[in-house]
């Protein structure tokens, strides 16, 4: 028997982390989306500033995939409250899809596994990017740092991090319509074998560094010569910002998802005040307005009123 009403919340996320394209993402506590499921005669989406056509909305598309596959009636209202800013590389579409699936799981008492929830939520991403990529939704559902593999079967694993990291996110006031879809179209169709080998080594270095607390491995691992350069026109200030952050002892820096936001990993050695000032100066130099937020790693999606795990 469905519950009367269920609300779930899911955090924003930063995907790729340099070398981990479509495989690594981290949940951040800076912003959250909320989705409420309630009984309704027919299927209805509500919310401010979002597409209300379910086929064009990540939460709506994820919900349809879940309901239809499990043979459930579409007699629900889905109310979406956007807290994650759209189009800035912070997993906004993924947070909505993750919160919707989490709420539906609780509303119908389905007892879905994390992989099953991710599978439905990633279908929702088609509405935003044109492809069902699992990295952002995995982080928003599971929380923490998540590694995703998706060949014949989808597997998502939370990686335990050694160290106390804070994250500075440089968020420019730039908006590109259908940015994620456009950014994916900029990617190279093929890469040389030596580029693949170098990228694989960097991803391994990043994971090993985060698990061991080795900042040099993290710094090496968050470099990328494939995806970020192909999209540099979307964030021309990036390399200046990265050099500035590293000069002020940030552990590492990378484009957040498809941009245009930039993620900087900081620890006790980092001069965060100087990094903040440097971000403002670089935005000004490029005639861009923007802001800087500080975030911590977040837990995953949760049903409001239920216990929350870190």
Swiss-Prot record:
Tell me the GO molecular function terms: ATP binding; homoserine kinase activity
What family does the Swiss-Prot or TrEMBL record give for this protein?
A: Belongs to the GHMP kinase family. Homoserine kinase subfamily.
Q: Which Pfam families match?
A: GHMP_kinases_C (PF08544), GHMP_kinases_N (PF00288)
| E.C. no | 2.7.1.39
- Name by which UniProt lists this protein: Homoserine kinase
Broad class of enzyme this protein falls into: transferase
Keywords in alphabetical order:
Amino-acid biosynthesis, ATP-binding, Cytoplasm, Kinase, Nucleotide-binding, Threonine biosynthesis, Transferase
Summarize where ATP binds, as residue positions.
Answer: 85-95
Q: Which gene encodes it?
A: thrB
The subcellular localization recorded is: Cytoplasm
Q: Name one GO biological process term.
A: threonine biosynthetic process
Q: Which reaction does it catalyse?
A: L-homoserine + ATP = O-phospho-L-homoserine + ADP + H(+)
The task this protein performs is described as: Catalyzes the ATP-dependent phosphorylation of L-homoserine to L-homoserine phosphate.
Pathway info = Amino-acid biosynthesis; L-threonine biosynthesis; L-threonine from L-aspartate: step 4/5
Give the Gene3D superfamilies listed for this entry: 3.30.230.10, GHMP kinase, C-terminal domain
Q: Which PANTHER family match?
A: HOMOSERINE KINASE, HOMOSERINE/4-DIPHOSPHOCYTIDYL-2-C-METHYL-D-ERYTHRITOL KINASE
Q: Which GO terms describe its cellular component?
A: cytoplasm
């Amino acid at each position: 028997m469905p519950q009367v009403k269920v609300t779930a919340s899911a955090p924003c996320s930063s995907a790729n982390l340099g070398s981990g394209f479509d495989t690594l993402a981290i949940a951040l506590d800076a912003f959250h989306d909320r989705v409420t499921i309630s009984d309704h005669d027919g299927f209805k989406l509500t919310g401010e500033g979002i597409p209300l056509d379910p086929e064009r909305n990540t939460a709506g598309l994820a919900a349809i995939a879940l309901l239809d596959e499990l043979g459930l009636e579409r007699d629900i209202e889905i109310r979406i409250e956007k807290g994650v800013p759209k189009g800035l590389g912070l997993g906004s579409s993924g947070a909505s899809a993750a919160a919707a699936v989490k709420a539906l799981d609780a509303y119908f008492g389905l007892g879905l596994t994390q992989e099953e929830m991710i599978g439905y939520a990633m279908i929702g991403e088609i509405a935003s990017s044109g492809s069902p990529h699992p990295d952002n939704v995995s982080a928003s559902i599971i929380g923490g740092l998540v590694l995703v593999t998706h060949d014949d079967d989808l597997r998502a694993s939370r990686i335990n991090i050694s160290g106390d990291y804070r994250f500075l996110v440089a968020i420019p006031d730039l908006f590109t319509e259908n940015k994620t879809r456009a950014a994916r179209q900029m990617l190279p169709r093929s890469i040389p074998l030596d580029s693949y080998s170098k990228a694989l080594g960097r991803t391994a270095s990043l994971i090993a560094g985060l698990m061991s607390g080795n900042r040099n491995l993290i710094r090496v691992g968050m470099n990328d010569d494939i995806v970020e350069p192909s999209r540099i026109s979307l964030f021309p200030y990036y390399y200046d910002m990265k050099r500035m952050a590293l000069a002020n002892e940030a552990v590492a820096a990378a484009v957040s998802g498809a941009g245009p936001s930039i993620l900087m990993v900081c620890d006790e050695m980092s001069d965060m005040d100087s990094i903040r000032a440097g971000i403002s100066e670089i935005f000004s130099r490029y005639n861009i307005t923007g802001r800087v937020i500080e975030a911590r790693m977040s837990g995953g999606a949760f049903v409001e009123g239920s216990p929350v795990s870190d």
